Amino acid sequence: KTPSAEYPADYTGGFILINTKEIPVSNSLSFTVGGNWNDASLGDFSTFSKSTSSLESMGSSLLTGGFNNDWMVKNKNVYGDLKLGMNGAYRWQLGAHRLGLIAAANYSNEYRTYEDMQNNLFGVYDVANDHSNYLRHSVDDQYNNNRRIGAMLNFTLLSPSGNHKYELKNIFNHLTNQRYTWREGVSAQANLENSAEYYYRSRTAYNGQLTGKHTFTGDQLDWSVGYAYANRHLPDRRRYLVDDAIENGQMALTTGNDISREWTQLDEHIFSANVNNKKELKFNAWTPSLKFGAYGEYRTREYKAREFIYNWDASNNSLPAGFRQMDIPTLLSDEANLGAGKLDVLEQVRWRNNYSGHNTLGAGYLTASLPFGPLSILAGVRFEHNDMELISNTRDNERSESSRHYRDDDLFPSFNATYKFNDQHQLRASYGRTINRPEFREVSSSVYYDFDLASSVQGNTELKSCRIDNIDLRYEFYPSRGEQISVAAFYKHFDSPIEWTYTVAGGTDLIYSYKNAQSANNIGLELDIRKDLSFIGLRNFSWSFNGALIHSRVTFPAGFKEENRPMQGQSPYLVNTGLFYRNEGQKLNVALLYNRIGKRIIGVGRSEGTTGSGSDETARIPDSYEMPRNVFDLSASKRFGDHWELKVNLRDILAEKVYYKQFAEVRYADGSHKKVDEIVRRYKPGRNIGFSLVYKL
């Protein structure tokens, strides 16, 4: 949580260092098989025949020779989730060298059903008629099948002296999400609407790193070179919509735009190199140290999107009579209805939805560790040069590439001081500057239609980096081994924070995008406790608690039609606590966990003129909030002998509904006012009951 010059500066809340095992103490191999039951996701499950082919692999006749024309929805019974895992650790003696291997693989297949999910869009409250202004009022049934394959393979080679260590680390993950959504609702024009989305997404990520650590007299040197690859493919996302716009109560196709297919593909490559050196100094009894290093990263990204709509000649076609009123999956699955003179496909050429980019980051830093008796100071500065080039098209109808650079050159100072009163008590104070740079997708003009939001999502080419000043004052008390009580006060100032916003376009449609606010300030208190409870007679019990209170405010220039409010995504409080039981004699572990966060803005609304009710009050699309909910988890593990272990867990025991709300502030011409709760989304996630059985060789 404390900035330091040796760490990358592009973060806001904290930086996570992940260390994996190197050379194991002994050889081991274990296998895990497990299951999970979500009580909202058992029984009937709707799915479809997915497409995995790229457009490039299809022939010239897409409708009859390339597209998957099976639109029929299949139903099957779901009995739960499956999880499999394997972990291995081995060590060898190669002459005087030691070699270690850590390997792991896992597989999971899970089903999640969200039925009767309320999913609404609201505009500015209708003061004249005193009711909420629905841009869409709908109920969704959504069926998700998520699969994951993961693997890790790490090698470590240690020199005979132990002063030189080399590691090769590899992590691979492949995730897929197959989702079918059925939606029934009413549009802003008061038309009945039925729509569906057939969604299949695959994501692949690989991260490889070769590192070295070397200890010399007075110096500790470490280095790394790495390569990472990530992709996100959506092959053939299909959507259709029918409504009663033509004839009241009669659901039918209105236009060809109501049936669409879309292919998107995102590929990213990252190359990196890093070197650090720590030099121990000695001036009589004073032993300061210096640490300095450099980091370089080059990233490339390419995003491609193609969209097709179904079209027909309204006056001259050979389609069945009344085809507009037919069941759409039946209509589209019959190839007799496809082709020239029938239902044909037309590509929506939108070159502006494609982009590519390059990002070059170069950094160097210097820190000094200065001990002064009970006071120790770690001070440093980091320089980062970042150049992000976005290559996008300026016109939809043809390739028209234009390049734009987003460059930052920044110094990031950091200062950490620790005063140690004794072995149990110490006081910490820190300051550091960090940055939050926009991502490619946030500055691209590419438009993507999000079916869940029933809205388009678009980047903002004028987005700029946010710089954060962090101040932290922390008192720490260590009563005994493994115990800690700390109290902290912190302050963060954000210059131009990046936020997720939405606004009305075309009268009834919402567009989500990103924007910079002028500034924001967060000030808070944090309490962290880890305590053994044997002092009150509860042997083998321990308690942990982490809680924070945060006051957050975004500020805008004078005269702006925006309200001072909390920063998007920031909760006013959070609570994480757990009660743990650990009995080594019985080989039993039990944990009860509780989590709650305060309501937080997930989408920033905006002003839209005046209310039009005889008042000069500003009309606003309200901010959208994720509401608090109580989450209890219970887990237990029991070892049997030297080989078997049984793990059981209950997650989200209360299974409280998830709510997203807006709060419309309504003011009337006579001066009276009220607040109206508007439910943007509501669904029940279900509780999870899981077990796993581990066998160790």
Where are these regions (language model features)?
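C-terminal beta-signal and adjacent terminal beta-strands/loops
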Residues: R596-G612, S637-L697
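Transmembrane beta-barrel wall of Gram-negative outer-membrane proteins
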Residues: N69-T181, T204-L210, P413-F415
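A beta-strand signature from Gram-negative outer-membrane beta-barrel systems
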Residues: K1-S30
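Surface-exposed extracellular loop regions of Gram-negative outer-membrane beta-barrel proteins
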Residues: N231-H233, R324-L343, D387, D423-N470, ...
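Signature of Gram-negative outer-membrane beta-barrel scaffolds
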Residues: S138, L175, S260, T264, ...
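Outer membrane beta-barrel strand-and-loop segments of large Gram-negative receptors
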Residues: L266, I270-N274, F323, N460, ...
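Transmembrane beta-strands of outer-membrane beta-barrel pores
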Residues: G35-D39, Y107-Y111, F172-T176, F216, ...
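Gram-negative outer-membrane beta-barrel transporters
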Residues: F490-H493, I511-V604
